[in-house]
């Protein structure tokens, strides 16, 4: 999201790294709280802290189900598509040159978009659709006993998939919006220079 905003919306590139680190730190701390809160339950369900409960913190191909033959490459494709849809729709919802939702409804609608993507695209890779959302909790789980946090249920290095996929998909989705929709919207009309709006007259009292 942050990279796409910098590439297409004028967000300062010098702020991309601090914003990304802030998101990563937030996800990391949140995962530590979850890990702490469910210490006893996780120890009972999975004493070895294995792939069985890794999905509490981070994504896996087919959500760790070996009966669904999803590899890291299938999951990468899934992440690219899901994040592209997310960014295309976020740009559509927040573009003031179009018909944005009123009364500050944009955050609510973006939340619904994320839920919809999860319901439609969550089977293959758990819909991380944001590097920080996966990497932060994955790091937290690794530091608290999940030695296999970086690998999937097949033993393959998997941590890079929810990082690379959303980066590619985010730029792709934002670019598609700009090419297919954004460039056809009318330009914003600038206010004439030097004019001060006149106050509206007060209604006459009866």
How would you describe each model-predicted region?
Residues 1-206:
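Membrane-interface helix-loop junctions and terminal tails of multi-pass membrane proteins
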